[in-house]
Structure formats: structure tokens, C-alpha cells
Amino acid sequence: MELIHYYEDLNTLHVGTEKPRCYYLPKKTDGTDSYRLLSGNDWRFFYYPNPQSVDEKFVLKDYENPEYVMMEVPSCWQSKGYDYKHYSGGAFVIPYDPPYVPDENPCGAYYKDFDISNEELEKDLYLYFEGVEAGFYVWVNGQFVGYSQVSHSPSEFDITRFAKAGKNRLAVLVLKWTDGTYLEAQDKYRYNGIFRDVTLIARPKSAVVDYTVRTTLSEDNTKAEFFVRLDSYKGLPNVTVSLFAPDGSKLANETLATENKDLETVFKVNDPILWNAEHPTLYKLVLSTDDEVIEQKVGIREVEIKDGVMLLNHRPVKLLGVNRHDSSPTDGYTVSREHVVRDLTMMKKNNINAIRTSHYPNAPWFTELCNEYGFYVIAEADFETHGTMDLVGEEPIYRKFGKIVQDPAFHDAIVDRMMLNVIRDKNESCVVIWSLGNESGYGKNLIDAGKWTKEYDPTRPVHYEGATWAPPGIENDQSCLDMVSRMYPTVETIKKYLADPTSVKPFILCEFVHAMGNGPGDIEDYLEVILPEKRIIGAFVWEWCDHATYEGKTPDGKDKYFYGGDYGEFPHDGNFCMDGLVYSDRRPHTGLHEWKNAIRPVRATLQEISPLKVSLWNRLDFTNLDDAVIVTYEIKEEGRLLSQGSVAVPSIEPHEKGFVLIPETPKTNKNTYLKLTYTAKQRTALAGEVLGFDQIALFEEQDEVLTPVSKTALPAFASWSVNETADIYELTRDGECIVFDRHLGTFAKIVKDNENQISEPMRFLTFRAPTNNDSAVSKEWRMAGYDRSTVKVYETSIQETDGVIEIHSRFSIASPAKQPFLRLQAVWKVDLEGTIILSLDGNFDKVFPYLPRFGLGLKLPNDKTDVTYYGYGPYESYSDKHRASWVDRFDTTVDDMFEDYVFPQENGSHYNCQYASVGNLYAKGKKPFSFQASRYSEKELDEKAHNFELVPSDGIYVALDYKQSGIGSNSCGPRLAEKYQIREEKIEWEISIRFDNGN
């Protein structure tokens, strides 16, 4: 098919399209819709390898071809079995040769018949495409209508002159790549097709086309002004503008006569009910003509930046949110309202109040839902040119990164994308910040896009993180940017910015704490800085959901999820798309629980122990704490409930602190904790939802004393007989046999009741299956050989004292071709009850990278599945990732402890345990330890690429860890903070284990 190559012409972005307008779908004056969806299962589709091979007759009204299959619209053709799925984290998937794209440019040819009534034919008819990737040509009844691109922004075509009464034929040719592909190198799967709705709109000859709504407030918020302006119209309509209160009562109306250039009005509202994310109250604006009605829900609110602080309704506000893609594991970019409502409902229940639409406008009705549900939105343009970083050459990074934004040829295309973003969503109250795009360097093209935005909409601040890459030497005017934005800074970087007297703009973390796999860790360290600092607008976790694609089930019934490279595509970024707080199917990761409690609406601190007095910090921005939550408490001593009840919540204004008294003060010398739980009040939208908790230590024992049971204590107990050889020490008595391997430095056999309790010799653990956030440092771990370390025992000795057997050993741990990284001395005591106490001390060679873990591993028979532990649960927990958990006694199973990440990795450990049991194994530490039990070895988790490939072992692997290093977010963020690393030079550890009779 011969096409005019608009798709390779940077001077032609849209042909035959209407000027962009705000999003709405009009109604008739009788309340019925003036539009209808052309979406459905009745489109015909054929996939072509390139434009040249397209049958040019497919656009004709009467064309029929049995090879064209039925296709659902909206959908992505890759999700329907055509082409292949391709994940790229930012690299261009075609050669960099703008504006050109490969000749082998796959195409989807669509056609659909639809009827137009005589009544509709008397009106102006428009086709509204909400989203098509990447570029598309449109024909109606065989006549060319136009062309457009910018995948995630709408395109509207006037088809009045092409339409006929009765049957009409719509034909669309979608190209996989255009010159716009160079501007859409976001971190996402690359899908194609008509992936959002197509709507036919019938409008009167005289009608409103575009309008702007703005609200302003008096300083004391007692008066509001509702500004309405007609930006464009056709004909000379008389437009009645009406304002309705949230309860439906009419507050005001005025008629604007366009014939007289009467184009704007201002309504004054006394004692307005203001919109914010905590109370998303909406007014209704109605624009009526003789033949049409447009309805717009509007929240009264005002955004400003003053003295380096972002204010909403004259109050400091904190945006604690997520980055969100439109993403479905089965349908790609195509998401339904029900799908999005599920996302928003989950977010709301998890204390999330803000969303960055990364890195493109989400579905056009998305912001309407955010208005209703209460979210602050950073609305981002469909723009990222990350792929220029892969170009070959010696240019400075700021030149390479900014190659496109500094190229005049791309100027209009970049500004166009921001215009489409802003104009579509300008009337949506939830949008509080505009974003120019993502990771594209900095230069004149973006500067002009920012300046246009500031001029067009001076009521909202403008964001762009990529100005970071703008040193002297290029045009570096950042006056169009209202905040300093950073991705994954260290806590120290944030503190440094705040301490700099020249830092006058507010600070925002548009991406932080990478939620990939088992993560994120280190949230609390950031929030300790973010929450109290008014100059920090907020922070957005990367990201909301995993983007794995669902590919059915294995023969044994396991779900199969694929990621980058699983389709043979190149280039790809592997499982880097698996970085969400929720799985692709929206099951929560433990990271979501972690983020939820980290941003809980209340924070408690202990003020006095007797009487028990607790300070409550109301972290909400607009709600008195007494109106928001019910506070209940429980006090537990080592897992045993001492008391519980509710607390009368005092009146505490937003951002302020107050005090509560707990009516009981326990007298105890054991581990005792107060847990406060915050539940949403019944009159709130989240009625009954638990919004978070605090746990406060009232008393914590310093150290357990691990004392072996001797003859003096139990004179009637049988003593151990000792058999010593060059290889082993064998301890025996009736029905019991314990064998110590003098070469391994651990016990190889523990027989009790004539049954071996361990399936393999014990071993020292120095490696874990790397988490995604270990991806960088795990290379160092492998270089150090932690994954293949062996023990060298230099000497052992055995003695008996008062019935207690003591085995002394001196040994090191090293890997092939490397010197030892650990030199240790151990004393193993076996007492008369069969309890084994390990006392270990030694040194770590700090020339090596920090250890992922250090501990003792046991393998138990596979029927030992019941688990009890006293430590941080119920979720997996680590030194920097335990805010979702609390200290308690938990009863669970090995299977329930396993966190089934799509990309297998370290999981399911529990931090700060006093004791733990698996089956009849019982372990207790002198100091708290980390504990884990799993059907999978770290080797199995390390070697398999997908969870459906995992094969459970014939036993249960138990890890009793002196420590595990923290989780962090180093897959994209900074290196794990040193305080969470195992790199102390001196190691001292004491732990006891025993096997009881029975389970």
C-alpha cells in the first residue's frame, strides 16, 4: 500500500485532526448520550509485516476478506497472538536513525461497519480515538480522513463530510513504529494497536468545543471563585453555565452569549467545601446549549508554592504515592474502568494518596476517577528518550542524554506532547502538578514545553526530573520548573539539599525505593527526613505493579508469567519490569504492606512508662485525628496477651501532636510490647479498614542466657558415650546418636528415638539467592565466592565437664582462588537433654564485600512443616524491611512462609527472632536472630529464572542466621546503607538448638 510517510516526517505530527480539547463526552438535553462506543468484538483485523504488503483495497466500503479475523477493540495485537511481546526498560528497539524507522514496520489493518441515523447525519460527527500505538491512518467509506500519532493521547477527527446515512465503513491502519517511537522509550512492554476506546460523537452545529475551569480561594478559605472560560466553540451558541453543590442544589447559573464575545464568568461560593485527597468533595459544572449538555465534576481547591513549600488550599500537603502504568498481565495497555477502580481502591486502602502517571497520560477517564476517589496526580506527558544513552560515541553524558531535547528538528513534536497532556486534563481537580516527561536530558525543546505550560496554566506547578542532567554548557533555563526533582537519591543527598541556603525550590522524589522483587527496604530512613520537612513535596515509590505477562498454566497447574527475553526479543531488560508493589494480577507484594504502614496516618512515640503515656502525631493534612481513626491497643508479654482496649482519641489537628493515656501499665521483666492499631472510622470512605499500627517496646530483655543442662542439674540423666576417630566425634546413648564431622566443623547426624533428625550435615551459610535489589552487589558476592564457600577446619578437640560435652574447633571459610574471608572459633556444647549450644566468635576480612548473610543451615525431613517463631511477622522481615510486621508469637507453616516471587530470590526470612521451631526443631538465640524455613534451597532459588520452574526439595531448609544484610533498593537506587550490611570485623554469636520428642 502506498502511504504518504507522515510517520517519518517530524514536521507532520497530525493530519486532519481537530485541535486538542479538554476531555468530556457530551449528552443530549434529554440526558441521553450524544456518543456511542465503536469498541467491541466486531472489528476485522489483519496483521501485515510492513506497509508495502497491505492490501490497499481494505479501506473501501465494500471490502471483504475472509483472511481478516474478528478482533476486539480496544486491545493490543500482541495480546491477541500477533507479532511478539517486547519488554525494554528504555532502550530503543529499532536502530537510532530519526526520523526514519525500519521498512519492515509491522501494521495492523482494521475495519468496522457502523450505522449512522438520519438524525445523527444532521449533526457534526467526530471520531475520538483515546489511544493508538504508534501511528495510524484513518479512512471512512474509502476516503482518507487523516493521520495521527502520540500513542497515549487522544486524537479526534471530524468525519461529517465523509459520513452517510445507513452503513458506514471505518478503516484504520496502525503502524508499529513512527518517528514518535524515538519519543516513547519508556520502561514498559511495547504493545501496539487500538488499545483504548474509539467513540463516535454526534454534536450540534453550534456547540462548545473547549473550556477551562479554575478555582481560587480566599486566604481564610471561606470564599471561593469558580472561573469558567469558553476557549473554543463552533457556531454562535448561547451557553448556560450552571454550578451545583455537592448535595445537588443549584448554586448559580449564567448564560454566555458567544455572539457578543461573552466568553467567561466567575461564580462566587461562600463557605465552600474544599477538595483534597482525604475529602474528595466534588461540585458539578454544567454547560448547556439548546441541543447539548456537558457535565464536569470539579473540586474547589487551589495549588501554590510559597516560600519553598507546596500548599493545597493554603496548607502544606505531603504526596506519598506511586508511579503507575496502565498495565494488565493479559491485555497489555488495555485496562477497563473496573481494572482501574481496583487499583485505586487498593491504593486507598494502603494509605497511598498520590499517583504519577508514568510516563504518559493514563486513560482519559482515569483522572475523573482520581477526582472521585481522592488522589493527587502528577500528570506526565507521553515522552521519554532514554535510549539515547546507548548510542556509541564520546559525547558528554548531558549531550548524549539530551540529544533529542537539544535537537531543533524535534522541537514541535516535544511541545505537542505536552500540549496534548495539559489540554486534555486541565479541568481535572486531582491534577496538582504537570510533568514534562521522563529521563530525556534537558534542553531548549523541553524548556519551551515548560514555558508553554506555565503560560497556558499558571495555576499548577511544573515538574521534570531530567533537568538534573543540565550542567553549564547547554541552554539551562530552569525557570519553568517549580521544584527540584530527584530519582533514588541517598538520604544524605536530600539532607544536603535542605541544608543548602541557595536551595529555594521545594524538593520531590519522583521515584524512590525501587520495589523490585523482595523490596523495597530502607523506606523508614527516607521518611524520617521526608515526613517532618515541609519543603519536601513528597515521594513516589517505583512502582505500582509488576508488568509480567500471563501465559497460562504449566502441565502441573502453576501459573506462568513471562518477562523480558522470554519471547526471544532484543534488546530487552529481563525481569526489570517486575518492580511493583503488587504482582501483575494485583496480589500484594510484602512491599505494599511495608509502604502502607510506613505512611500510616498516625505515628506514636512513648512519652512515659508509668503512667503509660503515648504521643500521637496526626500525619493527615486536612483531617482532625478524632474524625479519622479509632485507636485500639493491646499489651503482650512474649506473645501472651496482658491487656487490650480502646483509647479515647483527643482532638488533634492535622500535623499536630497530642497525648493519650493507656489505662494499664504492666509490671514485667520480660519482652513486653504495646501495639496501637488505627482503624478508619465508620463515617469515612474507608470505614473499618485498618490503616496501620505502631508497636512500642515497653521492656526488652538484653540477652538470653543459654545454659547447658549438666549432671548437677539432672543427676538421673544418662551420660553420653564418646567415640573419637580422625573424621568424627560420635556421641551415643539409648536411642540417640550425635555425629560431629571434624572436617566440616558441624554436626552430620542427629539421631533421636532412632530417627535421624537432619537430612544433611549442618553447614555455615554465607550466601543467599540474590534479590533483585542485590543485583549489583551480587556480582561482588560471586567474585568473592560466597556462593561456593567451603570450610577448612584446622583443629578440633573434645572434652566432657559435668556431663556436658564440649567440642572446640578453629576453622576458616573461603572459596576457590580466594583467601579466607572468615576466621572463626566455635565451641559446641551438647548437654544432657540433647540441646546443642553453639558459641562462635571470629573475624571477617573487610577487604571483602559485605556478607549477604551468616548463619547455620539445617535440612529437615519434608514432613516437618509446622512453624512457630517469636519475632517480626507475619510478613517476611529484614533489618531495613520490617515496618509492616510486629514482634509477636506466630504459628504458621513452611508453605505459608514462602513468598512466591515470579523471579525466584531470597524470601520469607523473619528478623529479630528470640526463638523459632520447625516441626520438632527448637532454636533459641542469646541475641535475636533471623530465621527462615523453605522447601527450596538458595541454590534452587538462585539458578531458576521463573517461579514455575522451581522444584521443591525432598526436605525443609532451615536457616538460623546470625544476621542477614538488609534489602535496600539498589536494583535502581543507591547502594545498601552501611548500617544494614554485614561487614563488622568482629563476629560473636550464640544459639541453641534441640530436637524434642514428637512434632
In which residue ranges do the predicted regions lie?
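An acidic-aromatic loop/edge-strand motif
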Residues: 8, 76-79, 84, 91-98, ...
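Accessory beta-strand-rich segments of carbohydrate-active enzymes
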Residues: 1-21, 28-29, 44-48, 68, ...
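Extended substrate-binding grooves/exosites of carbohydrate-active enzymes
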Residues: 1-31, 182, 292-615, 619-627, ...
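Beta-strand-rich binding/interaction modules
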Residues: 140, 222-256, 613-648, 658-661, ...
